């Protein structure tokens, strides 16, 4: 039994005698305070990371090439499991042949497949693009929807694509875009323990102010491409290193 002061939460409420415990029981309010404190520190670190990323990549923006929201939607669908660089090599010919939703909806499926073949999963992507454009015409008056729920009705569109289209097509920030770079970096930075993109997005939305949600994603993507790569990250060159638990852990190991 520990000797010394008896904490209030160690006492029997009826007799006032010390409970038979080997360590002090932490009251709920204390546990809650610790949790809040940890979250507050993580949020402060997230904001410092954002400041540094803004300094590193002040002009960062979406790297996909497009002229209209329909083209942005199509390019973002094509970017699934593919680099923006590869997509940008495909879209000039694609949009020259099929510049809008009507042209894409009426496109010959085999011709569409051939044009997007090099982006991977080309059959599914071509089918989704054609069907999505037909839905835009029939259901949304030929306009790419501005509502998250409506965008998610389109084939080939999950939250990542919807967030990109809303943010860069309409300036509407409703979520955090989570791609492979954002997932990798936020896990390494200790900002999330999840692997599911929706859960990662939820964690990040709690840490970063809403106006910066898309700025955060874009700059993490830039940093993931340039420094914090999937293999052989350049930690010795990283200006985020002293805020990164993965770097600190590797030094201990």
Where in this protein do the model-derived segments appear?
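Short intrinsically disordered, low-complexity segments
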Residues: 18-19, 230
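Short, Lys/Arg-enriched N-terminal segments with co-localized hydrophobic residues
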Residues: 22-33
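Catalytic cores of DNA base-excision repair glycosylases
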Residues: 34-253
């Amino acid at each position: 039994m520990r000797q010394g002061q008896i904490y209030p939460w160690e006492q029997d409420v009826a007799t006032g005698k010390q409970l038979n415990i080997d360590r002090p029981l932490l009251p709920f309010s204390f546990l809650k305070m610790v949790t809040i404190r940890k979250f507050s520190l993580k949020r402060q670190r997230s904001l410092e990371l954002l400041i540094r990323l803004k300094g590193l990549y002040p002009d960062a923006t979406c790297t996909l090439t497009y002229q209209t929201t329909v083209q942005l939607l199509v390019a973002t669908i094509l970017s699934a499991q593919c680099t923006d660089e590869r997509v940008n090599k495909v879209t000039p010919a694609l949009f020259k042949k099929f510049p809008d939703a009507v042209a894409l909806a009426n496109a010959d499926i085999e011709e569409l497949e051939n044009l997007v073949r090099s982006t991977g999963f080309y059959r599914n992507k071509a089918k989704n693009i054609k069907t999505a454009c037909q839905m835009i015409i029939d259901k949304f008056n030929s306009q790419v929807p501005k509502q998250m729920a409506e965008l998610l009705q389109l084939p080939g569109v999950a939250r990542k694509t919807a967030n990109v289209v809303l943010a860069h097509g309409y300036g509407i920030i409703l979520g955090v875009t989570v791609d492979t770079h954002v997932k990798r970096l936020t896990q390494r930075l200790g900002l999330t323990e999840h692997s599911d993109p929706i859960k990662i997005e939820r964690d990040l939305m709690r840490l970063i102010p809403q106006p910066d949600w898309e700025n955060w994603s874009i700059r993490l993507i830039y940093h993931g491409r340039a420094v914090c790569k999937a293999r052989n990250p350049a930690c010795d060159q990283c200006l985020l290193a002293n805020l990164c638990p993965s770097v600190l852990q590797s030094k201990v190991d």
